[in-house]
């Protein structure tokens, strides 16, 4: 199975592609989509076209993208949400299912600690994929998103969807974990 991970951003959108066979992960490609210093519509179009091209060239089976977090600056949050929307449109236009994970879920799945630093993420991605060099932070986050989806991301999403049934049994999902 081939998974495309996306780390959305208005200026720089990271992408990472891995192949998964059982518990084995193999690096395929990674990089960034840089948008020009231009109006918002042009930047969003660049993200959409870039993601669409990656989907066409690498033919992933599934995709995973980071959920928007609420920033201190509401305007920044809105802009990030629009960039994310453009990326999702590129994924959906390519016929891909889209899984969504929070930054906390991503870091927990890849590093084992939800408050991991960018450097820790880069190091773990490098080790997990046996890379010869360390990817940039945006590409590393995108590769991490693909790894998260491959290794338990599905479980985290499923647990979140089961929340109402779990609550009836006195259980809940907290930070991606089942707790009593």
Swiss-Prot record:
Pfam families cross-referenced by the UniProt entry: RuvC
Q: Where along this sequence does the record place binding of Mg(2+) 2?
A: 66
Biological process according to GO: DNA recombination; DNA repair
Listed PROSITE patterns: RUVC
Q: Name one GO molecular function term.
A: DNA binding
Give the reactions, separated by semicolons, that this protein catalyses.
Endonucleolytic cleavage at a junction such as a reciprocal single-stranded crossover between two homologous DNA duplexes (Holliday junction)
The record's cofactor note says: Binds 2 Mg(2+) ion per subunit.
Q: Which cofactor does it need?
A: Mg(2+)
What's this chain's function? The RuvA-RuvB-RuvC complex processes Holliday junction (HJ) DNA during genetic recombination and DNA repair. Endonuclease that resolves HJ intermediates. Cleaves cruciform DNA by making single-stranded nicks across the HJ at symmetrical positions within the homologous arms, yielding a 5'-phosphate and a 3'-hydroxyl group; requires a central core of homology in the junction. The consensus cleavage sequence is 5'-(A/T)TT(C/G)-3'. Cleavage occurs on the 3'-side of the TT dinucleotide at the point of strand exchange.
Q: Which NCBIfam families match?
A: ruvC (TIGR00228)
Assembly, in brief, is:
Homodimer which binds Holliday junction (HJ) DNA. The HJ becomes 2-fold symmetrical on binding to RuvC with unstacked arms; it has a different conformation from HJ DNA in complex with RuvA. In the full resolvosome a probable DNA-RuvA(4)-RuvB(12)-RuvC(2) complex forms which resolves the HJ.
Can you name this protein?
A: Crossover junction endodeoxyribonuclease RuvC
